[in-house]
């Protein structure tokens, strides 16, 4: 379990293809990240959220953590486009004794979205994120002023447009832009999206009209 509060931006040191993909099965990959001081207390087998994707540490050598990713995870997330030298959002799993500053984040990405527009104001930046037409039903999990996870970051939904653009908007303060990947992403870039856990369970329990 995570909270969506990013601890650090860390650099991808290497990427290798474990198994080649094709039109039916995506490639399986392994990659390593220099997680710096976040490696203290971590062990092989523990989980870290990388851009919002819950991954298991398969190797740990000093500050370098390695992860193996199956094809299904690559297909459903933005991990299909990561590059060596790129910086990613990192959060270690939450301790039971820790402060809960964000919201419940599992690290199970529901879908990806595209940054459709980026509007810069003096005190904030507004991002409009578009979700593909075939995932339009996912808007049942999105609540205005409710929580959503974008690239592992706990954020608040500002507006929803599920009629014309299949989009939602979020507002980012300078601190978030400086401390996360959303400060370096541009229009057209993909992002990982995880809908609010509570919304998903409530939607599952309630009868559909």
Where are these regions (language model features)?
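Conserved loop->alpha-helix
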Residues: 1-209
């Amino acid at each position: 379990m995570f909270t969506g509060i990013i601890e650090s931006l860390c650099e991808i040191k290497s990427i290798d293809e474990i198994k080649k993909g094709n039109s039916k099965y995506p490639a399986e990959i392994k990659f390593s990240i220099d997680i710096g001081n976040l490696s203290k207390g971590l062990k092989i087998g523990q989980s870290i959220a990388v851009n919002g994707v819950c991954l298991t540490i398969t190797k740990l050598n000093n500050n370098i953590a390695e992860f193996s990713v199956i094809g299904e995870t690559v297909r459903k997330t933005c991990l299909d486009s990561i590059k060596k030298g790129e910086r990613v959002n990192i959060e270690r799993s939450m301790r039971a004794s820790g402060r809960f500053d964000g919201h419940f984040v599992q690290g199970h990405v529901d879908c990806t979205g595209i940054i459709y527009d980026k509007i810069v104001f003096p005190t904030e930046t507004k991002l409009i994120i578009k979700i593909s037409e075939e995932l339009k039903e996912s808007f049942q999990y999105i609540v205005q002023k409710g929580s959503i996870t974008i690239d592992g970051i706990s954020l608040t939904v500002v507006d929803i447009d599920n009629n014309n653009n299949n989009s939602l908007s979020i507002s980012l303060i300078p601190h978030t832009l400086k401390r996360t990947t959303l400060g370096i992403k541009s229009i057209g870039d993909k992002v990982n999206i995880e809908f609010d856990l509570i919304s998903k369970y409530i939607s599952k329990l309630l009868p559909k009209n």
